Amino acid sequence: MANLAFKPKQTVKKLVSVLPQRGRDVIISRYGLGANPAKLTLEAIGDKYGITRERVRQIENASITNIRKSAAFKAEEPSFEELRKLFEVLGGIISEEDFLNHITTKDKSLQNHIHFLLVVGSPFKKLKEDEEFKHRWHINDELAKKVEESLRKLYKNLADDELLPESELIKNFLEHLKDVAEEYKKEEILKRWLSLSKKIGKNPLGEWGVAHSKNVHVKGIRDYAYLAIRKHGSPIHFKEVAKAIATMFDKKAHVATTHNELIKDPRFVLVGRGLYALAEWGYLSGVVKDVISKVLGKHGALSKDDIIDKVLKERYVKKNTILVNLQNTKHFKKDKEGKYALA
């Protein structure tokens, strides 16, 4: 929480006091500056006064203009300068949510007063939320443009299913920020800039990727299972997967439900009795017979030992299970040299 030298609520009170009664009421209602921090819509304010939404908007805009022209506004220049310096420290461009939460996370009324000071203050420029970015404010057009363009490039270079540690994403981000002043290249500022993007996101394990990806936008048990197995780094029993989901994400995961989700999702491959791995690790899907077929299809005729060696890299099974499957003459044939091939 930031400690401000001025008191935002007192500052706003002085600024709105220069307005006529109706203008003051419109501003207080519109920005949630009264006892109730709820903000009223143009329509609700219009209904209260029996005027149109457009008329309310005109009164709001005129009131802001009058405040900016007032002696009270001039007198509060040090307050606006303090906010501007805080913006500079936080990175020059920051999401509205992050900035207000930096001031306070508990006092909604105080947040509303700070927000109003950003609206009337001349150094601050708002960029509305769109498909790419959140609501954000900045104090430097050129910097804002560079940061947003760098975030676009960062997103374009991410594969849909890619996950990166935060340190690696920041390193990649810096590659696109070479023209930005060194003073901004601090980790906490770079993280704030990353949070501006709606296209890039962070999963519950702190790994970054494309925001709409299942690996980042985690919904159901199968998505949590994917992250749990990926974190484990090697094949794991479905019962342990359920335990890992509960431990890592504080989510209830019934063993049977978890097992069913692992069976249904192509991201997972059964590699032994109850043991699951990720398909992206290169494990072949299917029963042992299918794995032998895929191995022979890729490598051609192989000796019994070579087949066992290659299948055991894909499956946690007994050697005898592989040998039994090789006796299936419908699928496999043995030549004079003792090598096996597809029938």
Q: What do these predicted ranges mean?
A:
Residues M1-A343:
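C-terminal non-catalytic scaffold/interaction domains in large multidomain proteins
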